[in-house]
Every structure is written in C-alpha cells, then in structure tokens.
Amino acid sequence: MLLGALRMEERKGLMGRERDQFPVGMRVLAVDDDPVCLKVLETLLRRCQYHVTSTNQAITALKLLRENRDMFDLVISDVHMPDMDGFKLLELVGLEMDLPVIMLSVNGETKTVMKGITHGACDYLLKPVRIEELRNIWQHVVRRKFGNRERNNLDFSKECNKPQSADTDHGPYQPTCGSSDQNGRSSRKRKELHGEDDDEGDDNDYQENDEPSAAKKPRVVWSVELHRKFVAAVNQLGIDKAVPKRILELMNVEKLTRENVASHLQKYRLYLKRLGAVASQQASIVAAFGGRDPSFLHIGAFEGLQSYQPFAPSAALPSFNPHGLLTRTSAAAAFGLQELAAPSSTIQTSTGNVTVGHCLEENQQANLAQGLTAAIGQPQLQQNWIHQEGNGLSDVFSGSSLTNTLSSTLQRVPSSSLPPQELLECKQAKVSMPPSIRIPPSSSALLERTLGVSTNLGDSSISQQGALPIDGGFSADRLPLHSSFDGAVATKLDTSLAASQREIGQQGKFSVSMLVSPSDNLALAKNAKTGASSSGSTIILPLDTARHSDYLQFGGASNSLQKMDGQKQDHIQSSNIIWSSMPSTQLPSDTQIHNTQNQRLDSGSFNHNIGAHLADQTNASASILPQMKFDTRISEEKMKQKNTYDLGSSKLQGGFNSSGCNFDGLLNSIIKVEKDDLPFMDNELGCDLFPLGACI
C-alpha cells in the first residue's frame, strides 16, 4: 500500500515540473505559401520561445508529420494554398495523428470559420496575426494532452475502484488496484471481451452483407435462340401492339421475367428506329445521285423552267432524270451513239432551224405534260399529244413484199383519248436543238411495235395516227418482244424485201429502213441505206412517190423535186430515226411523228431512214424503249452554198431559239385552246416531230 502511494506522488511531481516549463520549447510546424507571412509568423513564434519548423508547401508538411509523429506538438496552417487546400490538410492530420491544428487566413467570414471548426480545427486566426494570440496557443496543446490523459486516468480509476470477488485472499473492502498482476489480468480480460464482441459483430455483418447478394436476380443472357423467340413473338403481335406481358406469354421461357422482356423490347425498338434512319439516308443519297429506283426518286423542277415544280413519280408517268435533259454531243458520233448508249436512250437533233407546228383537232388522243404545276390551274395535267387525221398518206409505205412479212410483227395500239380542253396548241416554234435529250427507260412488261399506226408503251406512246393506217396492207398480228427471234425470221424478212431494196436504191428520194436485230447486240450499221446490220437482217420499206407526189413536192419552184433532181442528188435532206432496244424504267415524255394532210414538206428531196432494233429478250420483265435521233437539213440557201452534205459531220448549234412560241405563250395555250388549223410557211418543214418536253 505504501509503495503505491509513493508511485502516485512521483507521477504528480513529474507532471508539475512539466507544467511549469511547458510553454517554453513547444514544437510548432508553420505552413504558409506566402513567404512574407511565413517569415513574420516564424519570427513571432520564436519570440514566444517556441521551437518552429516552417515550410511553404502543404505536401512537404504532411510528409514531415508522417515521418515523425511525435516530432511536433502543434500545427499552424494557412487555409488557401496552391498545392493543397488547408481544410484537406486539416482532415488528413486529424485522421492520421492526434495533433491540434490552428487555421490562419485573411478571410474572416463566419461561413469559412465555421467550416474550419467543423473540420477539426482547434482555433481560427485572422491575418495579420498578433503576438498576443500566439502566446496563448499553447493551451490547445495542453487541453489535447491533458484531455487524453484525464480520460486514461478516469478509466484507470474505475478499474481500481471495482470490488474484489469473495473467493480472493484480500478483504472484501480492499482495493484491487495495488497489484500490477491484477491490472494486467484485468486489461487482458477487457481486451478479450472486446475481441469477442468484435468477432461476433463481424460475423453478423457478414451475414447481413450476404443477404442482399443472395436476393439479387440472375442476369439474363439473350442468346440467339432466345432472341429469335422474342422477334417471332413481336412479329406475331405487331411492333405497335407488342407489350412485355403478351410477349412473355408467347415466348414461354422459364426464369424470364417481365422486366427482362420490357428492357429487351425497348432496345429492339431503338434498333428498328436506327435502321429506319439509315434507310432514309441511303434513299436520299440514291436520289441525289440520280438512282433509277422509283421508290427512291423525287423529281425536281426542270432546269431553267420556273413554272415546273417537283412531282413524285407515279405508275402513269415514269420518273424523269432532269440532269440528262440537255447535253451536247457531236453529230459525227450520231451513227455510233447506238453502241455507246445501250442503257439509256438519247434523242439528238442536228439541225439549223426546224419549224415545229402543233395542230389541234377535237378528237385528240394520248397523254402529254403530266406533272405541270398547280400555279397554272392544273396540278395533274395529262400529256396531250397532237394528232391530225390525214387520209393522204394511207398507203405511203407500199410494197407487196412487206405485206406478209410484217404481218406478225405489227399491231395497232390506239392511244387513250383526252378532253379537248386539255389539249395543247403551239403555233410555230423554231427550235435549234443540238443537245442530246436523254430519255430514261420506262418500265413495260410487253412492247408491241406498230409501224405507221401506234406504239403504246405503257405510259408512253409513239404513234403515227392517220399518216400510216393499217388498211394499207399491214396485218394486226402482235409479236411480243419478250419472246426471242430466230435466224429464220431474219432471213425471211431480208429475202422478201430484196426487190424493194433495189427499187428504193434507184429512186434515192424517200426511203424507210427498219433493222430487225435477232440478238442482244444493239449496234446499228453505220450505213443504214445499204441494208447492212450487225444483227443480220434489214427491212426496206419503199415509198410510192407517184401516189403521194402532192406531199413530197409543193411550194416554190426552187424547191421542186424535179429541180433538186436536176441540180444534184447529193443534196438530200435526211432524217434518221433510230430505235434501240433497252431496259426501260423511265420515260419523261412520248415522241410522235405526224404527217397530216395539211402539212407540207417543202424540201426538194427528203430521205427518211427509220431503223428499229428489236433485240432478243428472254426475260419477260425486260422491255424495249425507242431511242431516236433526228438529223435534218432544210434551208435551201445552205444547200446551194455547199456541194456535198455529209450526214455524219453536220455541225450542231446549241441553245433554244423561239420565234413564234415562247414559254408564256406555251403555258397560256394549255388553258386557252385555239382550234384553228395553222398553215405552214414555204421553205420550212412543219411536222409534229417533237413532244412538249423536246420543245421546252
């Protein structure tokens, strides 16, 4: 008992001596990024007889504290520092080591001070700091040290004041704190008790943590087979009516919840939406680059015409590509153009001035100018072809050898009639059209070619009504061109027309030649009048000029046929119409040829070569589209100036010249119809060789 009392006195004496010398030599760590403030703070602390260690970086201060935990008693740190905020340093020091920290700053706002205190600062000083404040900072060190010591002493006193158990050798009222062995045993018991509690707590925590993980649902992996069932269920219900509940019932898959199906359905709808966006983008690209698929095409306005507006393609009118409307080409390549332009059709005009006269009758037929704008009052105006009945040229194409040969290849296909108020009349338009007009293909399941009567190509027609009627000896038997030709047919056609070829060679004034091609070769012979064809057969249709001399010679004496024969046979005005077979999906307008009774051909000599390629087709969906070329010379003055006219080397003139019909008059004539017949001037050719699209 006496030994214990002596020890207590020694401890009190040591504590008394420390308390008497404590402020002197207190170890302080000063941290401030401002060197001036740091120097002032260090000087003031030294005046207070503190041992000072200064640094201008918070990271360096933290490193020093971690290396030597017992090296400092107090830390004074600035709040705002570049490398680390003062509050962050305060938190780290408070967590890692039990040292008092004093914050130092120029910001004295209550909010900032409150933040420092709540983060664990023992004091908050404002700059400039005073020495009086620094002299009292030691109290925080004492409070922290003696506060911890008092707590330890309190625990120690509680252990000593506990009553001793009855079975011990000591008396019932003797304290048990005098023996060190008893203190050791009590501390060990206390640690073991706390250790058991900690182990039980850890076990409970482990069980509690295992329960949420066990309650989690397994992740669903959408395999290929599972996705197929999902897609089949969605297709059966419909994408608009598909709901997760019904999809789950149709799929009938175990361990698949409604939430899984709902999530997958949402992703599937987003996938379909992205596919639709990609498809629309591809359609726009195809339309921009002139694709031929009608579902992707949206036709724009015609180039240079403000009155035409874009219109969508329909089944009645195939799509039209305006980019190929007017393109220049040389006349020298007129004969070779058939071989180069197989996938598309071109109309090339090689002429100086061609007078195009459109005459109207009340019993007009066929279609024209579909897709004119709503600005002129007719948003869906049908194309009006100009026809005029004429009985004078009923037997223009004569020859007994052609009667039986072409009986199986020709058929009359009349055009559909339209009301007279939708017909178009254009008085006279002088057109100088050297550019080639590209006619995109037009879809047709069957093409039945009719010479002299009509050719109805689905939405397009090439007719010569009245000019070449069928009662001149031609039969109406049809020959669908999707069936193949053979060599016997070509030989028969060539043999039956040999005499007619010799006869027309002697006349040399007006000839019509048709080339029948039994194969897919679309190349036309360069000289059509010789009857040579790369396909093998040639049909020559002679003209009975004696019966129709009134159509071939009229006007002034200078243009008479006898005068032309007397001057030179080389002065021949030729017009080549070349028809080429090709797959067709687009055709903007139709082409007609009319030679009516009141039309006059004022040229002295007229040579008309017509060639038609009928290609062997095995596919029923393929069709043949006429490809036409016009090379015309009319002016007699030009014929007098030159001795020889070369049909393949005529110079083309570009542009559009309108003397008798302008755009305003052309559009006004759609609404107001003039039904009077129009006379034709001498020395000019008046015929309906061009549709409205060609005039424009």
Curated annotation (Swiss-Prot):
Compositional bias of type Acidic residues: which residue ranges?
195-211
Database matches in SMART domains: REC (SM00448)
* Keywords per UniProt: Activator, Cytokinin signaling pathway, DNA-binding, Nucleus, Phosphoprotein, Transcription, Transcription regulation, Two-component regulatory system
4-aspartylphosphate modifications at: 78
- Specify residue ranges for compositional bias: Polar residues: 176-185
**Subcellular location as annotated:** Nucleus
Q: Which residues form the Response regulatory domain?
A: 27-142
| Post-translational modification remark | Two-component system major event consists of a His-to-Asp phosphorelay between a sensor histidine kinase (HK) and a response regulator (RR). In plants, the His-to-Asp phosphorelay involves an additional intermediate named Histidine-containing phosphotransfer protein (HPt). This multistep phosphorelay consists of a His-Asp-His-Asp sequential transfer of a phosphate group between first a His and an Asp of the HK protein, followed by the transfer to a conserved His of the HPt protein and finally the transfer to an Asp in the receiver domain of the RR protein.
Family annotation (InterPro entries): ARR-like, CheY-like_superfamily, Homeodomain-like_sf, Myb_dom, Myb_dom_plants, Response_reg_B-typ_pln, SANT/Myb, Sig_transdc_resp-reg_receiver
* Gene name tied to this protein: RR22
**Disordered: where is this region?**
154-214
Whether Nucleus counts among this entry's keywords is: yes
Q: Name one GO cellular component term.
A: nucleus
Give me the positions annotated for DNA binding.
214-273
Recorded protein name is Two-component response regulator ORR22
Any Gene Ontology biological process: positive regulation of DNA-templated transcription
Record-level Gene Ontology MF annotations: DNA-binding transcription factor activity; sequence-specific DNA binding
Q: Name one Pfam family in it.
A: Response_reg
Q: Which family does it belong to?
A: Belongs to the ARR family. Type-B subfamily.
Task of the protein: Transcriptional activator that binds specific DNA sequence. Functions as a response regulator involved in His-to-Asp phosphorelay signal transduction system. Phosphorylation of the Asp residue in the receiver domain activates the ability of the protein to promote the transcription of target genes. May directly activate some type-A response regulators in response to cytokinins. Functions as a response regulator in response to cytokinins.
Deleted gene: phenotype: Dwarf, narrow leaf, lesion mimic, low tillering, late heading and low fertility phenotypes.
